[in-house]
């Protein structure tokens, strides 16, 4: 009897996990989804999110919190705020976006920003060097783009590599 109950519980958990995997992605609609010109947006964190959403890279809508994005502990890198998004164009990528208050910088923020400016990386709390960091042209925003499908062997032929470069270019284009 115990084995049957355990089996039923396992099957129930498996069904619940599978049901959450293929759900539809809700994307931005209306004006925020149609205007792709960086000039149409203000220099704010929310407008950066709306701009990247208009290009179809992320989904920042509040009703999707926990599904398409997660609030991050931005203070760990000295940032004002940050979110990690599941990229909308591939299942293998996440895009983290952080805002720094340049008028009220702190030692942690200064260290992270200067390291990213120097070589696109910094050392995390464990002393490991972390790459794939990109600073906006105005130095106020930081993006971390991580795609597990891109390797040194596939980067010349991988469609995701090309898409990553497109996202980086659009990010840097915002409020030059």
Question: Which ranges hold each PLM region?
Answer:
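Positively charged n-region of N-terminal signal peptides that target proteins for export
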Residues: 1-4
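A short, solvent-exposed beta-edge/loop patch
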Residues: 121-176
